Amino acid sequence: MTKKKNPNVFLDVSIGGDPVQRIVIELFADVVPKTAENFRALCTGEAGVGKSTGKPLHFKGSSFHRVIKGFMAQGGDFSNGNGTGGESIYGGKFSDENFRLDHDGAGVLSMANCGPNTNGSQFFILFKRQPHLDGKHVVFGKVVEGMAVIKKMELVGTSDGKPTSPVKIIDCGETSQIRAHDAAEREKGKSKKSNKNFSPGDVSDREAKETRKKESNEKRIKRKRRYSSSDSYSSSSDSDSDSESEAYSSSSYESSSSSDGKHRKRKSTTRHKGRRGERKSKGRSGKKKARPDRKPSTNSSSDTESSSSSDDEKVGHKAIKSVKVDNADQHANLDDSVKSRSRSPIRRRNQNSRSKSPSRSPVRVLGNGNRSPSRSPVRDLGNGSRSPREKPTEETVGKSFRSPSPSGVPKRIRKGRGFTERYSFARKYHTPSPERSPPRHWPDRRNFQDRNRDRYPSNRSYSERSPRGRFRSPPRRRSPPRYNRRRRSTSRSPDGYRRRLRDGSRSQSPRHRSRSQSPRKRQPISQDLKSRLGPQRSPIRGGRTSPAESLSPSHSPSPPGKRGLVSYAD
């Protein structure tokens, strides 16, 4: 059984003739039901006329005759108006119900009496907590709305209890009754309005109209489904005549749909590899979906292009036999002949440029105009960024730094063996000689500097940072794999040559200075090696030696006879 909600009553109070302000009070009928019911009936006036007083049992028109500042405001004497009258709905006085509730704060309502079991109609509202009244007066309610009105009532109070301005109850009642009455009035007004507007015939007409509207909506939905299914799942046959007719119909459909100036509806298509002309369309999209379909989808379009490039050429040859146009027009006609409705910029760019590399990012061309179309996608710089940490690939480096020799034989400096005066420039110069300069100019200076700086970052960081670089194994053991690697990219210059190139083009770092050995620690070189290697020093280098020359015998793993060999390893 659900618990019954406590009733709420209201008092419309006017202080000193001011406009009416409302106080809403909750009655604790769950704790003191008899006392709460007495107050509720006195607010509504439903009990009629009192037996002893002969006056209506109603608070309406009565006043708060006693208001003491900081204590309470007392009222409810509807018969005399001075605290000597009043009557309960039970006739005369009634006994104290219980004292379970305390006078614990402002806004608490309690019954006024002249001793035990003398409860009538008079009550008081506390302005603050009054614990000394507990056990003497029965608490039955509390103010839930209008505490500002209670504070205003306190302002007109005095110490003797006579208010400076009259505080009168203009109206009172139960809030649930008012809400129910208002709801009933609203329902009555609605029913009158509906009876005025709609007769029984009008109601039937309206129902018939709604039925017709529903049927027409269903028909329209069916038509849409039929049209979209027939349009989206139509597939072309394998014959050339069918593909040509469908290409014509698709182009006419697109022109008609775009003639009204609205957005053209795109359809993303997918080609199956097994059958030549078969396509499945994803169906019509609404106006809101037309814009996202315009955006090039990299995944779907790349799959479509890679699987349908050969089929497009087969089907397109028949459509453009009689027309002689350039390559761009041929590819445009090829698009129309295979009824491609996905006209993303990626598809047009791929067919116009006919690049066979799957990488779609811009490829950085480093000074070489005639690149082979069969570039490996691994060696293309796919993202085209110019980050200083990006490694140039072997093939691009080889293309840019290769220079033709006078005899047509590629210039390769081997590992210190077979030196002649022809290759002495590699030991004499910091930078390449004019005959070894690149044949083509760089696109910009920053590009050249970035390439020089980042040409071999792994080798540079290893030789400069790691202390294990001084203890490398002899070049004779590592020559077969290194030789094979140089056979693939013939443009790599020797390690010592690159180190001199870096030292000449950059400022001298303290790291190189700390590594360079003094002349007295240098090991003596045999006369045979001196004649083969030529002059080892240049005034420009400032007396610095390469790390391979400055190895001490205790650290060098090579035998004493080969101690002075220079290693030109990559």
Curated annotation (Swiss-Prot):
Gene3D superfamilies registered for this protein in UniProt = Cyclophilin-like
* Positions of the UniProt region annotated as Disordered: 180-570
Q: In which tissues is it expressed?
A: Ubiquitous.
Chief subcellular location = nucleus
**What GO biological process terms does the UniProt entry carry, in alphabetical order?**
protein folding; RNA splicing
Bias type Basic residues, positions: 262-292, 340-351, 468-490, 509-523
Q: Which family does it belong to?
A: Belongs to the cyclophilin-type PPIase family.
Protein name as catalogued: Peptidyl-prolyl cis-trans isomerase CYP63
